[in-house]
Structures are given as C-alpha cells and as structure tokens.
Amino acid sequence: MIRITERYIETEQTPVIAGVISLTYDERKRGRLRAKTQSGEDVGLFLERGKTLLDGDLLMAENGDIYTISAAPETVATAQANDPRQFAQICYHLGNRHTPLQIGELWVRFQPDHVLEDLCRLYGLDVVRESAPFNPENGAYGGHSGHSGHSGHSGHHHGHDHSHEQSRQDAKELSARYHFHAPDHEHPHGHVHLHAHPHEH
C-alpha cells in the first residue's frame, strides 16, 4: 500500500501526477482513509485531521509521488430555483442550518435530506436526487470537518436535529403565505412532512 502523508505545496514546476484518487465528500473530510487510485493502486491517506480535501488538491506520498484528488460522483439532492429572489431565500434558510452547500447558477446542491428537500419544495424549487460530484463551499463550515474519533457522517448529523426544529418553525411561519399546514406530530422516522391543503377564498 502506498502511504500518502502530506499535501503537496505547488511550485512553478508542474508536477508529474502518479495517479488520481476519487473520493466522496464524506471521504474527503477524513484524515485517515484507505482507498484505490483510478488505476487500481492501493493507497492509504495519513493526513492532518480537520481539513477537507478539495477537488484538484495534490498530495505527496512517502516515496515522493504526487497524487491528485477528484470529487467522486455520489447521490445528492439538487434544488433548482426559478428566479434570483427565490434562490436567495433558499440559500439563506439552508445556510442557517450550517449544512454543506454547493452553489451554482440558480441551483443549490446538498447531501440527501428529506427535511431540507421538503423545505426547498415549500419555497417552490424543483428538487431532484441525482449522482454528481459534490463540492460544497469551503467557507466557515470547512473548519468543522472531521471531529476526532468520529465517522465521516458526524458533521452532517451535527446539524440534522437542528434542521428538524427549524423546518417546523419555518413551516408555521410560512403557512399563511403558502397555504401549507405543518402537523404538530412527527412520523416514526423523524422527518417532518408538510401537507398542502387547498384553501378557498
């Protein structure tokens, strides 16, 4: 197994790439990981914890070889907005949940979550689940990646309970505007379901 122990500091000279390592977002948050290159070589990552690897990052192995990181396709939820105002609203509310977000041209992408997907639909966005590379914004959230001794899912779970409560509050606040009713109970699986009922005026 090839041991990869440090990030490569780029110089003016273009490095020779020995291999490409494709990793999902949760895998890129981990400092210790066994993986394979796209050509099938076994590699082990032994890196400083707490810094999420980004698509295109270069790493150096103990033998001096340079490897590049590629964001692997994974299941994601992509929400498409119809106009800039709608887009700004959903970015604001999703941002309040401290969830990793990839932001595009009037679309946002996040890890699958029924609560967040329902919230996007509540604001009128079209939501689809698809397979695509996930490259969230590397802002303040990046400093929280990978707590010591936790699995790669710890960062996502940390804000999940909070998103449930926030979604219930949002549903109540928006019920008059969008004619949605939010039930006071929770279903066994813990997700809030927003039921729309037609109103006569």
From Swiss-Prot:
First-listed, main subcellular location of the protein, grouped into a coarse class: cytoplasm
Family: Belongs to the UreE family.
Coiled coil (residue ranges): none
Disulfide bonds: none
Cellular localization per UniProt: Cytoplasm
Keywords: Chaperone, Cytoplasm, Nickel, Nickel insertion
GO biological process: one example: protein folding
Compositional bias ranges of the Basic residues kind: 190-201
CDD domains associated with the record: UreE
Cellular component annotations (GO), alphabetically ordered: cytoplasm
Organism: Hahella chejuensis (strain KCTC 2396)
NCBIfam families in UniProt: PRK13261.1-1
Composition skew (Basic and acidic residues), residue ranges: 162-173
GO MF term list: nickel cation binding; unfolded protein binding
Residue span of region Disordered: 136-173, 182-201
Summary of the function given for this chain in its UniProt record: Involved in urease metallocenter assembly. Binds nickel. Probably functions as a nickel donor during metallocenter assembly.
Protein name (Swiss-Prot/TrEMBL): Urease accessory protein UreE
